[in-house]
Amino acid sequence: MQLVLAAKYIGAGISTIGLLGAGIGIAIVFAALIQGVSRNPSMKDTLFQFAILGFAISEATGLFCLMISFLLLYGV
């Protein structure tokens, strides 16, 4: 029983590594937004819409990793 519990904790910890990628992805999206607005301020509204879309896609991958982690901890 202790081995199964340890495996659940290790699996949940490993599955949260995907959150690192989501954080980096969000940082890249908003860095590109700042760079794009500084180059062409008149495109601010259009660039912001694309940045929010990129943020949502990046955040979704992080939430999927977090969901798998919770499923490993509490679902099995």
Curated annotation (Swiss-Prot):
GO terms for molecular function: ATP hydrolysis activity; identical protein binding; lipid binding; proton-transporting ATP synthase activity, rotational mechanism. It is a multi-pass membrane protein. Keywords: CF(0), Hydrogen ion transport, Ion transport, Lipid-binding, Membrane, Mitochondrion, Transmembrane, Transmembrane helix, Transport. Pfam families: ATP-synt_C. One of its GO terms (cellular component) is proton-transporting two-sector ATPase complex, proton-transporting domain. F-type ATPases have 2 components, CF(1) - the catalytic core - and CF(0) - the membrane proton channel. In yeast, the dimeric form of ATP synthase consists of 18 polypeptides: alpha, beta, gamma, delta, epsilon, 4 (B), 5 (OSCP), 6 (A), 8, 9 (C), d, E (Tim11), f, g, h, i, j and k. Belongs to the ATPase C chain family. This is ATP synthase subunit 9, mitochondrial. It comes from Eremothecium gossypii (strain ATCC 10895 / CBS 109.51 / FGSC 9923 / NRRL Y-1056) (Yeast).
